[in-house]
Amino acid sequence: MKRLARSLYLQVLLAVVLGALVGHLFPATGASLKPLGDGFIKLVKMLIAPIVFATVVTGIAKMGDLRKVGRVGLKGLLYFEVLTTVALAIGLVVARLARPGAGMNVDPATLDTKAIASYTNGAQAHGTVDFLMNVIPRDVADAFARGDILQVLLFSVLFGAALAALKDKGRPVLEFVDGLSLVLFRIVGFVMRLAPVGAFGAMAFTVGKYGIATLLSLGKLIACFYATSALFVVLMLGLVLRWCGLSLFRFLRYIKEEIFVVLGTSSSESALPLMMRKMEKLGCSKPVVGLVVPMGYSFNLDGTSIYLTLATLFIAQATNTHVTLVQELEILAVLLLTSKGAAAVTGGGFITLAATLSAVGNIPVAGLALLLGVDRFMSEARAITNLIGNGVASVAVSRWEGELDQARARAVLAGTVPEEVEPANEPEPPAVPAGAGLHG
């Protein structure tokens, strides 16, 4: 009982189980508990923009070398492109081999498209050009108010670069932002005490509204997706961590609290603040974490990438739409663009899938109606895979930059270093002599 009182992940796990039971036994009550999950996610999202700002600004300003900032960003984008391409390809291969939609013989004309109208209409506004232009905020206040991670990240990089260029004159501002970061993460600690409540409400709503019967009706597709996501984590991400000299299973145990929070809320964004702090404590470079993790929430959605190719071919198979190998490669090419616009929030993958089907053309968009009921049950695996992928990305880019404290990382994963201890590569910044840059 004492362990339950101290352990967040056990509390969240218990809340998820209880939420599923309430949703199954009392569907109407479960469906009415949605505000608990939504409220928790809103509390976390309230903190994401200022945390990204504070972390990125202090990281870049202390780094001093602006060429290094560009190098880290480019390495991060290259890593994201390779891993998400592999994830898309794996989803495509599994869909071809397992054929989860074969034999359903669905006539697209008989499907009710009213329920998916909001997704298809929203997808029209998520084109590649719109996405790229949206990285530039209309104004800074608007970016922070809406919590747009990429817009906040762009402003934060510019702000941090300006602080580094100001050198000594920027020291008071840097110290203020550094202190702000400590306050924000303390607030995160307060908010995370409500994680079990949010997980309970979100799970009760999911099971209460959609029911176990919906889950069983498309069991083959769900099983394929969960198995493929697990395979990607174990093989691909495990291989990356092995290159970094770390154990995948110890890494997963280290981030178990974040995994269970995401499991309960179906949103990898709900664990972003905790994940950034965990990666710093693991021994990753703070500037790398500040750049890579926020960018990853738009460019490194491995779980969503697997889902997109798997779901696209599932709809084609279910509606008896013949897709040639050339067309599959075209789908892959389209998804290389549209998947980068998938938000790390619940439902983002579904909207991106609608955009992809619209762009491809030969697969009926009406087929989305087949997924509407079960999509929510697959969002947990999407979000967890996205979370793990972004954590591994920060480790990999830190290792690539030569700024991963491997000895500390192994000790932390082995449990021989208390998590409360600040990372060894983040000492208190010394006084900066005249004419020097703002190095940490």
Curated annotation (Swiss-Prot):
Keywords: Cell inner membrane, Cell membrane, Membrane, Symport, Transmembrane, Transmembrane helix, Transport. It is found in: Cell inner membrane. One of its GO terms (molecular function) is succinate transmembrane transporter activity. Its main location: membrane. Belongs to the dicarboxylate/amino acid:cation symporter (DAACS) (TC 2.A.23) family. NCBIfam families: PRK01663.1 (NF002461), PRK13027.1 (NF009587). This is C4-dicarboxylate transport protein.
